[in-house]
């Protein structure tokens, strides 16, 4: 199977998992990226089975609306049963690195609200230790140099992601060469740096369920 086929398989598995639990009042949280796009496309075939969605980015909102799925602002939603999103890396404890698509802050907010966070990924994303994928950090633009210096003190090699602005109007610094053995601690340390909006570690609030696309089929991992 190609990587695209694996993504489509896990996206369909996520739809199959949540569909029996949805009703006409249900609102689904939806992530950002190529795997999340596969989920949106699969979910759209069942749009009559639920009320609408909360999007983690402008790009996701546009794709949902393109399928005729109503998109709600998170502040107007009192109950979010599911959040479905991809990941750049996951460890066996379902701690994640996310933010390759620069939507990490809104993704983290929607994940925090949802009762169940379902991560969908192809098998290459499961790693023994996080950090081979550069860790994205969303930063207030004027704090870029200060934050970079602090990230060096934490052992990282920060690289400014040129030409990228988040939906919130901020910049991204990608932190290379980190072996993240304590993701909960590092997430808190980076978030404590003045000028950081948030970072791409999803460890304080990890995924509840990981659907992993492999050549042997979709595997399910739980915490």
Curated annotation (Swiss-Prot):
Substrate binds at residues 32-35, 85-88, 98-101, 125. It comes from the Bacteria. It holds the Pfam family Rib_5-P_isom_A. Pathway: Carbohydrate degradation; pentose phosphate pathway; D-ribose 5-phosphate from D-ribulose 5-phosphate (non-oxidative stage): step 1/1. GO terms for cellular component: cytosol. It catalyses: aldehydo-D-ribose 5-phosphate = D-ribulose 5-phosphate. GO terms for molecular function: ribose-5-phosphate isomerase activity. Its EC number is 5.3.1.6. Keywords: Isomerase. InterPro entries: NagB/RpiA_transferase-like (IPR037171), Ribose5P_isomerase_typA_subgr (IPR020672), Ribose5P_isomerase_type_A (IPR004788). The active site is at 107 (proton acceptor). GO terms for biological process: D-ribose metabolic process; pentose-phosphate shunt, non-oxidative branch. PANTHER family: RIBOSE-5-PHOSPHATE ISOMERASE. Homodimer. Belongs to the ribose 5-phosphate isomerase family. Catalyzes the reversible conversion of ribose-5-phosphate to ribulose 5-phosphate. This is Ribose-5-phosphate isomerase A. It comes from Pseudomonas savastanoi pv. phaseolicola (strain 1448A / Race 6) (Pseudomonas syringae pv. phaseolicola (strain 1448A / Race 6)). The gene is rpiA.
